[in-house]
Every structure is written in structure tokens, then in C-alpha cells.
Amino acid sequence: MLLIKSIPAFNDNYIWLIHNNDNHCVVVDPGEAAPVLACLKEHGLILDAILITHHHHDHIGGVPELVRQFPNINVVGPENEPIPTLTHPVGDGDFVELFNEKFMVLGVEGHTKGHIAYIGDEKLFCGDTLFSAGCGRLFEGTAEQMFHSLQKLAALPDETEVYCAHEYTASNLAFALAVEPDNDYLQQYREKVLRLRANGKATIPTTMQREKLINPFLRTSEASVKQAVSSKVENDSEVATFAALRRWKDEF
């Protein structure tokens, strides 16, 4: 069984540390090195590898220093993104073995053109593609690409734990309630999230089951969501609904 620890970074980033019961570990999307190095020292851990989901600086900024400190580590990341420190470029359908667990690489373009996610041991590391109650902005890809990427993730088992890279849940829920103000589950969950955040606690990981109930970007087939954007779309396809939601969220 793999153990997951969050390493907070910047204002709202999570760097994820994956380890088993020995003193070896892997980190996902280390945007800065200092908090990773501090965590390794505190817990007596040895860094074996780095997993990267996409090329944005707040996800790779710490890689050069970590490579200097651990010159023999593997740096795994998307084959179609400009990341010069990669030692193992990977793409959709490839596998990465971590502590005797196989993680599959999923192509989830949209936020960036080559964004990938990693799924294994019922744990999903999805960078900036799927957030709790939200999704990433379309910096490089299209709405259609992001829609299909999210559908790919939504097809994962309900019990899948979702480890996204930012603590955006509270603000995302405010938007979700603007879309579905009569969603009782959303209202109750937002109250829970606000209590957690008031106490300085994380809302991540979430689960795929929960996201299907609270995330408007995974609920594009729901009549309530379609109705919320009916004046903003030319047709009622799910892709058009998603695109309208994303435009609305950008301005929210």
C-alpha cells in the first residue's frame, strides 16, 4: 500500500510525496525544491524519482535543484511538453512502476497541449486537469480536448482518490452553486469545506464519486447544468455545455 503526503507550496499548490514503508519516495509536480528538501530531511526519506504532469513553472520550478541534490533520480513527464530535465518522457498508455505498483499514464490535454495524469493503486495524480469541483483553464488546448480528458477521468472507478495540484475547492464550490443553486449535496459539502479551510485543513484528496456529485464540469449531461448555460450555447451538446461553463468560470 502506498502512502501519500502533501507538501504545501506557494499560496495554494500541493506537491505530492508518494512512499511505501521504507525510506524511499517519489514527488509529483515539485514547483519549488525547498519544501521538498525540508520534508525529506524531516522524515529521513530518499528521493528516487520525480513525476511531472505538465510544464508550468509552479509544477517544475523545483526540479533542477532536486536533480542537483539527487543526480541519479529519474524525472518522468509528458513527452509532448518542453521540459528539458526529463529522463523518461511518457505518453498516453505508458506505464510507470512505483514501489511495485504500476501507474498508467493518461493523456489529458486541455490545460496544456501535452498534459498527462498518473493512475495507480486507486490514486489519480491529475495536476491541473481536474480540481475538486472544478477544472483547469484552457491555456493551450481546446474545450473539446478538455471535455474528453475529463470524461476519461470520470470513467475511473468511483473509489479513485483524486490528488490534484491546487487547493481551489472553496472558490470552485461557489461557482458550482451558481450553476446548481438547488443541489443539496453541494450546499452541504460547501459548509464542510468552509469549516475545513477555516481550521487550516486540506480538502484534497477528493474522490471520483464525490466529484460526479459536485463538479459542474463532470455534470454536463445533467438537466440542471444544461439549463444554467442554456442562454450561453448554440446547441445543447455536452461539449457546448462544457465550453459555456468554462467561459463562465473564467469570468466568475
From Swiss-Prot:
User: Which cofactors are named for this entry?
Assistant: Zn(2+)
Q: Which UniProt keywords apply?
A: Hydrolase, Metal-binding, Zinc
- Identify the InterPro entries for this entry: Clx_II_MBL, Glyoxalase_II_hydrolase, HAGH_C, Hydroxyacylglutathione_Hdrlase, Metallo-B-lactamas, RibonucZ/Hydroxyglut_hydro
Residues binding Zn(2+) 2, per UniProt: 58-59, 128, 166
Q: Does the keyword Transmembrane apply?
A: no
Catalytically driven reaction(s)? an S-(2-hydroxyacyl)glutathione + H2O = a 2-hydroxy carboxylate + glutathione + H(+)
Pfam families given in the database record: HAGH_C, Lactamase_B
Q: How is the cofactor bound?
A: Binds 2 Zn(2+) ions per subunit.
Summarizing the function annotation, the protein's role is: Thiolesterase that catalyzes the hydrolysis of S-D-lactoyl-glutathione to form glutathione and D-lactic acid.
Q: How does it assemble?
A: Monomer.
Q: Which family does it belong to?
A: Belongs to the metallo-beta-lactamase superfamily. Glyoxalase II family.
* Name of the protein described by the UniProt record: Hydroxyacylglutathione hydrolase
Whose protein is this, by species? Answer: Aliivibrio salmonicida (strain LFI1238) (Vibrio salmonicida (strain LFI1238))
